[in-house]
């Protein structure tokens, strides 16, 4: 069963109630009490157990997992949405069978996750895979310095590679606002400004992924999120990565997620699988 509800933005207690109501609704009629996995924007700090690095800023600083467990009266497993996405694609998705997988989510934000031999890496600080808050590498004159990010920095990858980042690039070129999802339609119409915006986007994405390749050298790179539905990315970005990666050849497959926008919730369900997360 799949159900969507709106998140009560700005209301932490309302968010907890909404999640509890959704879980209760989906649990009704189940032959046994199901396990509960939650994917969320941001991470649970391994030291304080509070939420940090979330663009859902109203949950920042709260003990989300413990509060949800108390409200439900049972154990819950929670992980970053980029990690959950990557777990799903590594387990039975586009990267099934690969030893080292990097998953990149290009949607409302710009997230990521790393799965090695079936285990999602969290890291000492709980931020493994958080590439979206690194600066754009090999920046050139096409970058307009000063795009502020909710994290307090400027010119994070998220400000260029998220859907909003793509829309802003289009606005810089065309002088008018459009939503990111409208750009695909403009590309189909061969709109010159949309074509230029996506060309710039592809080069920026290639630079960002090349930095990942230079450090991790994954066997597969999986793209998810709304922008990943732009099909030309898969034809153009791999060749561009080769310009920046520290290698005389680039052979890593860059593939589209097979689970679509269900990847995060599928990965959350996998959190109860033994040894799934390097906590």
Predicted regions and their residues:
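Active-site glycine-centered loops adjacent to acidic/histidine catalytic or metal-binding residues
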Residues: 81, 107, 268
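A charged helix-plus-loop insertion that forms the helical arch/lid used to bind
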Residues: 49-61
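Glycine/small-residue-rich loop that forms an oxyanion/phosphate-binding "nest" at active or ligand-binding sites
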Residues: 77-83, 87-89, 103
């Amino acid at each position: 069963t799949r159900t969507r509800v709106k998140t009560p933005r700005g209301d932490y207690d309302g968010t907890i109630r909404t999640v509890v109501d959704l879980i209760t609704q989906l649990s009704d009629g189940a032959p046994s009490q199901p396990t509960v996995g939650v994917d969320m924007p941001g991470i649970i700090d391994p030291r304080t157990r509070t939420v940090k690095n979330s663009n859902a800023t109203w949950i920042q600083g709260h003990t989300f997992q413990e509060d949800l467990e108390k409200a439900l009266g049972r154990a819950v497993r929670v992980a970053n949405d980029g990690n959950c996405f990557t777990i799903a694609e590594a387990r039975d998705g586009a990267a099934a069978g690969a030893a080292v997988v990097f998953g990149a989510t290009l949607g409302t934000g710009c997230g990521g996750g790393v799965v090695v031999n079936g285990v999602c890496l969290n890291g000492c600080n709980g931020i493994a895979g958080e590439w979206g808050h690194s600066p754009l590498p090999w920046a050139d004159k096409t970058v307009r310095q000063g795009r502020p990010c909710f994290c307090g920095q400027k010119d994070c990858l998220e400000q260029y590679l998220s859907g909003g980042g793509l829309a802003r690039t289009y606005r810089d070129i065309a002088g008018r606002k459009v939503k990111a999802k409208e750009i695909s339609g403009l590309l189909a119409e061969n709109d010159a400004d949309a074509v230029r915006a996506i060309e710039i986007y592809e080069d920026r994405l290639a630079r960002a992924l090349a930095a990942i390749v230079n450090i991790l050298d994954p066997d597969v790179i999986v793209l998810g999120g709304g922008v990943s539905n732009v099909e030309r990315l898969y034809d153009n970005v791999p060749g561009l990565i080769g310009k920046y990666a520290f290698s005389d050849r680039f052979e890593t497959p860059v593939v589209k997620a097979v689970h679509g926008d269900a990847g995060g919730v599928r990965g959350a369900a996998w959190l109860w699988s033994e040894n799934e997360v390097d906590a």
